[in-house]
Regions:
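An amphipathic, aromatic/His-enriched active-site/gating alpha helix that lines ligand/cofactor pockets
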Residues: 29-33, 68-76, 96-148, 152
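Bacterial N-terminal signal peptides
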Residues: 10-21
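Bacterial N-terminal signal peptides that target proteins for export
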Residues: 2-12
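Acidic helix-start/capping segments at beta-turn-to-alpha-helix junctions
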Residues: 75-96
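Sec/Tat signal peptide C-region and signal peptidase I cleavage site
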Residues: 22-26
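Short amphipathic alpha-helical segments
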Residues: 50-76
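Solvent-exposed, acidic/flexible segments
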Residues: 47, 51, 55, 59, ...
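Immediate post-signal-peptide N-terminus of mature secreted/exported proteins
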Residues: 27-53
Length: 154
């Protein structure tokens, strides 16, 4: 015959289960560690019906500039992310740097990137400026974060 346990025993069991993870104290560099690579993430809300236009224009501006920086070794990687299910925000831009030091601005690096962009795309400068100025009409910057991945230590 099955007997019914009092409600307080179920509540106690639930609290015990919920409390167990709280008793384990995690410690950085013992249980987990942040990676040295830093990711800059920009979150963008593109106006409805403009996503295709925005991505096409982004390819001609931001993606080109990031490709130059990657070719020159200033960034590890970059990416454009979208969501089919999100209404807003709906675009995420990421730039991966080797470490925090690689994110520091430098006049030499700035000049080198601009010279390479000019060499590759200088004849399109007016069109690219017009595209960049038009971004504000179709998108809103929602957030900007510097994040890093966590590695768990066995």
């Amino acid at each position: 015959m099955l007997t019914r346990r009092p409600l307080h025993s179920h509540i106690f069991a639930l609290l015990l289960c919920l409390g167990l993870p709280l008793s384990a104290h995690g410690e950085i560099y013992k249980d987990y560690q942040p990676t040295e690579q830093q990711v800059v993430m920009t979150v963008i809300a593109v106006e409805p019906n403009y996503l295709d236009d925005y991505l096409t224009q982004l390819k001609r501006t931001w993606v080109r500039a990031m490709a130059v920086q990657k070719d020159l070794g200033f960034v590890v990687d970059y990416a454009v992310w979208t969501s089919d299910s999100a209404n807003t925000p709906n675009v995420w831009l990421t730039i991966t740097y080797e470490n925090m030091a690689a994110m520091q601005p430098s006049k030499a690096r700035y000049d080198q990137v601009n010279a390479e962009i000019e060499a590759r795309y200088g004849d399109e400068e007016e069109a690219l400026d017009a595209i960049a100025k038009g971004y504000e009409e179709i998108r809103k910057m929602v957030d900007h974060q510097i994040i890093n991945r966590v590695e768990f230590i066995d």
